[in-house]
Amino acid sequence: MLQYMSCRDAAERWNISQRRVSVLCAENRIQGVAMLGNMWIIPITAEKPVDARKNNGTKPVVEKAHPFVKWAGGKTQLLDVLKCNLPSGIGTSITKYAEPFVGGGAFLFSLLEDYRFEEIYISDNNKELMNVYQMIRDNCVELLYALDILQNEYNGLSIELQERFYYEKREEFNTIELTEGTSVRKASLFIFLNKSCFNGLYRVNKKGKYNVPFGKHKSISICDGENLTKISAMLQNVEIKSCDYHDVVRFADSSTLVYFDPPYRPLNVTSGFTSYTENDFSDKDQIELAEFYKELSSKGAKVMLSNSDPKNTNENDNFFDDLYADFNISRVEASRMINSKGSSRGKIKELLIKNF
């Protein structure tokens, strides 16, 4: 009878971390590995996999944590600019970090790679997205197992069957109610749909149902064990909320850095990708957010906010210049990453507004 060992046993035998063993299991790097309940079991005869992170005897290539989904308004292209604009005092006078509208988390992950905060708060009005964050934090191994199954099933199909498979999973995602018992399944479907849909969009109709069409990808890679495990470790002490951005007022104080990355004000009728939830973000909402920005500023919090620059299309549009007249407004160059017309992607100016 074949005997098995736990990840802990394998870690001791191979002189690597238990977390690394879990990643190798999730990536199918260990022959004969299986899932029992919510834990991996490994054949006692299994050999330690060759470390693919090493390159010809040089130092291991260590990739930084990066977003697990493609997200409209993602800040990957702006990370250097954002970091150059951080306030002084992080780690001393600034010990807390808050990010409502966290989205894909590019800035969050980059920030946590370089800085340590005593308390961290993230939120978003998209309950499905925040469920994924919670599952990565609390049930990463189960999530990786579910993603591995979806990835293998999809990649083994013809393009015609992949399309049918996509719409079956989209229907399942829209049908399942988000409960404790379905949280992992919904999170895995969320990531699958994001990576196999058209252009990486998240869009819902007026009934709140996800309605992005099939993206015709011949293969997908959604079971990134190393990245998700790294993110899981980062999120262990993070407060994760699915709520309106106003909730952060209870968390923010004079020792807090708050970064707002709300749905951008569209530059024209066709450029708005604000339907991440069933509620659009109007000019009235932008004005309300500006008032809240001022409220947090009056509490002593250090506040940064990104948004579109209307002067890209109308030099006389002073909407944000007037709203944030009392604060520091910078115009920075960014890349448009998601657009319904791929040919219209390119460089564009964005606003970065700070109270310091």
Regions found by a protein language model. Name each.
Residues 323-356:
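Class I S-adenosyl-L-methionine
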Residues 286-335:
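Conserved Class I SAM-dependent methyltransferase catalytic core
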Residues 1-20:
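Polyanion-binding surface elements
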Residues 7, 30-56:
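Short helix-start
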Residues 58-96, 106:
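S-adenosyl-L-methionine
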Residues 209-218, 264-285:
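Mobile active-site "lid"/loop adjacent to the S-adenosyl-L-methionine
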Residues 114-236, 274:
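Class I S-adenosyl-L-methionine-dependent methyltransferase module
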Residues 82, 97-111, 122-126, 191, ...:
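Conserved proline-anchored active-site loop of SAM-dependent methyltransferases
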